[in-house]
Each structure stands twice: as structure tokens, then as C-alpha cells.
């Protein structure tokens, strides 16, 4: 574990801790705070916000999601931002009720037991998990797979 910093979300006043080794978005999820997001890969801009105070390192992201002009204007992507200071962030898109009532993110290990072609462009995947998963309507899952080359790929379903 690295240094621990505090993130304050404006205008709602929610605060949480972030380790310098994790992204702001991952830290929020770990502590049960649901923030707007989509791809978690810096491609979609759903987690775009304004950094009002503090310093972050931005991991690789698409300039379609965050243009150079956006970045120069103080905008960041929470899914690609690692804190190196206490942060104050201005949320651009949020639902205050969702922020306070979200379900903490849980991590499961699993093994792919079946992979089949359903149509020409849709595949079915069965995953055997190491623990039961309670599913709520509207919930989704992020699946991270490590390739034979050691690359990790995450997709949301």
C-alpha cells in the first residue's frame, strides 16, 4: 500500500480515502460509493469530472474521452486518475441518492466453464465463481480476464 489521500466530491460533500496505487473510481467503489462510469478503461468519458484541487497521475486514456483542451481545463477521468495529494473533485454527472445508497463492490474469482457462439456476433460465457453472487435488478458485472500474454482486459456486462 502506498500513501493514503482523501477525496472530496463536490457539490455533494462526500469524502472517501484513496490509496495512491488505485484509481479514484476503484477507491470509491471499494467504499460503497457509486459514481458515474462506463468502460473503466478511459474510453467513454462517463466518469469525466473537474479536478478543483490536488494532483493526479492520469493513466493511459483516449483523447476522444478526454481531449487535450479538457485536460488543460482541469478535467480528469476518475477511472484513469491516481491521486498524489488530497483531492477535491467537482462531479459533472451524479445522482445524490445513488451516491449514498450504493452497494459496495465485491470481487470474486472464477473460471470460464463454457464459451459458445450464440449468433454471428454474440457469445455466451459461463463462469463458475468461488462464492455465490446475489444479483439485484439493474446490476451489472465487470469481468477481468488475464490473457496468455499477461495483459488484463476488463469489460462491463
Walk through the language-model features, giving the residues of each.
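Short, surface-exposed secondary-structure edge patches
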Residues: 36, 41, 130-134
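Iron-sulfur (Fe-S) cluster-binding segments and ferredoxin-like electron-carrier domains
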Residues: 8, 27-36, 46-95
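Iron-sulfur (Fe-S) cluster-binding modules
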Residues: 1-2, 74, 84-90, 95-106, ...
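Well-ordered beta-strand positions in beta-sheet-rich domains
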Residues: 15-17, 76, 88, 109, ...
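N-terminal pre-ligand scaffold of iron-sulfur
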Residues: 1-36
Amino acid at each position: 500500500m502506498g500513501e493514503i489521500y482523501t477525496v472530496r466530491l463536490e457539490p455533494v460533500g462526500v469524502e472517501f480515502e484513496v490509496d495512491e496505487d488505485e484509481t479514484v473510481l476503484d477507491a470509491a467503489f471499494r467504499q460503497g460509493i457509486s459514481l458515474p462510469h462506463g468502460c473503466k478503461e478511459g474510453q467513454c468519458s462517463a466518469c469525466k469530472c473537474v479536478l478543483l484541487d490536488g494532483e493526479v497521475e492520469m493513466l493511459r486514456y483516449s483523447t476522444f474521452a478526454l481531449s487535450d483542451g479538457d485536460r488543460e481545463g482541469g478535467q480528469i477521468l476518475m477511472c484513469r486518475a491516481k491521486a498524489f495529494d488530497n483531492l477535491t473533485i467537482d462531479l459533472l454527472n451524479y445522482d445524490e441518492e445513488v451516491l449514498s445508497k450504493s452497494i459496495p463492490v465485491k470481487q470474486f474469482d472464477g473460471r470460464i466453464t463454457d464459451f459458445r457462439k450464440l449468433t454471428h456476433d454474440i457469445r455466451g460465457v459461463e463462469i463458475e465463481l468461488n462464492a455465490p453472487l446475489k444479483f439485484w435488478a439493474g446490476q451489472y458485472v465487470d469481468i477481468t480476464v488475464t490473457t496468455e500474454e499477461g495483459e488484463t482486459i476488463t469489460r462491463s456486462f
